[in-house]
């Protein structure tokens, strides 16, 4: 990826990064559930909520921040994602939780669009592990 495109991705609206990150996380979790957990179809959605709900994402973010898991660059994206003003109302959660969830999704979206596959894979695997240990 060239420098100009690199900078373009960093400058994207953090909620745009979160939008992309939400899709990436959802696909990763669905793949994990289908291939690893081999659950019945009617249970798949219920199981995926355990990983992708705003509450779960917020708890995971808090844990990862306590562990100082994120790079400085990722912390900048997290802060932008958390502080971004959304014009939609959070469903089934409070604003703080929604913002934390958007923050971790923004980092996922950033890593995906930057094509940082190893770091993205490490983060997605870490999310699965953390949720499984709860």
Curated annotation (Swiss-Prot):
Claim: Transcription regulation is one of the keywords in the record: no
Main location: cytoplasm
EC number: 3.1.26.-
An example Gene Ontology molecular-function term: ribonuclease III activity
Cofactor: Mg(2+)
Gene3D superfamilies linked to this entry: Ribonuclease III domain
Role this protein plays: Involved in correct processing of both the 5' and 3' ends of 23S rRNA precursor. Processes 30S rRNA precursor transcript even in absence of ribonuclease 3 (Rnc); Rnc processes 30S rRNA into smaller rRNA precursors.
Entry protein name: Mini-ribonuclease 3
Organism encoding this protein: Staphylococcus aureus (strain NCTC 8325 / PS 47)
């Amino acid at each position: 990826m060239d420098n100009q495109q690199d900078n373009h991705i960093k400058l994207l609206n953090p909620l745009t990064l979160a939008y992309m990150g939400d899709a990436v996380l959802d696909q990763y979790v669905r793949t994990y559930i289908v291939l690893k957990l081999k659950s019945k179809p009617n249970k798949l959605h219920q199981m995926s909520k355990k990983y992708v709900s705003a509450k779960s994402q917020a708890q995971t973010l808090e844990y990862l921040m306590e562990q100082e898991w994120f790079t400085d660059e990722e912390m900048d994206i997290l802060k932008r994602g958390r502080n971004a003003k959304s014009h939609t109302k959070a469903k089934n959660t409070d604003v703080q939780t929604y913002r934390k969830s958007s923050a971790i999704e923004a980092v996922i979206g950033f890593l995906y669009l930057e094509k940082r596959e190893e770091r993205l894979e490490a983060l997605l695997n870490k999310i699965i592990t953390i949720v499984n240990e709860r």
